[in-house]
Amino acid sequence: MAKSEEARAPKRPMWTGSIAIGLVNVPVKLHTMVFDKGIHFRFLHKDDGQPLRYEKVCTKDNKVVPWESVVKGYETGKDRFVVFEKTELDAAKPESNQTIRLQMFVDYLSIDPIYLDRPYLLTPNKSDDAYSLLSTTLKKMGKAGIGRVTIRDKEYPVLIYPYKNALVLTTLRYPHEIADPGQLEELKDIKEPSSEELALAKKIVTDLSGEFDITDYRDSYQEKLTALIEKKIKGEPIVAEKPVQPEAKELMVALQETLKQLKKK
């Protein structure tokens, strides 16, 4: 039951609009680019092993509410709401609901990775002339465009850059969505390492330095989970083995022994 690791084709577009650069208009379609290939379990009723379903139940009369009777509301107080129709919510949609206006261009590597959220694939819509021009220009100059887009009732800052023969849009996180490490007590007043510790740590990093290749990495948890499922299907017993914890060592000793192990390779 192993799942194929072949690359998947993008699904149908989830957004259609255009990229605007001054008076230049680039018609595009936005596709999901990241897929969850993990194993998923369903919740079952323990007594009979049948799957559970979830329903929208009114908290007042405990009756199941059909989807056509569901509206959105904003809570103004305990059990007090103002109700919005879809047409009313549409009034709040900004220009970025249909147009990604690029406001500036930056070096792609100048963006702190902490702000990178989710990548989407941009494809040309109807005409590809302007799309090709933008993609080629960004690729030759090593630049990325900064703009905004509204997806599913939220406006995101975005980064648009070339990837292979396409353009990719990555949504960015707002500063207030990122935790401030300085607020954690554990990170306050951390002492500086000794010069000896730092020297050994630098040697370890140097010895382990190399070129990153994502294909070198596999999801070992999913592979083991697949093997367990196959055992379960065959009715074979499953025994959980506890991982062996490495012996705790004093920092300098651990650094020195790590260097020795690396030299043996």
Segments from the language model and where they lie:
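Boundary segments of small protein-protein interaction reader/adaptor domains
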Residues: 1-265
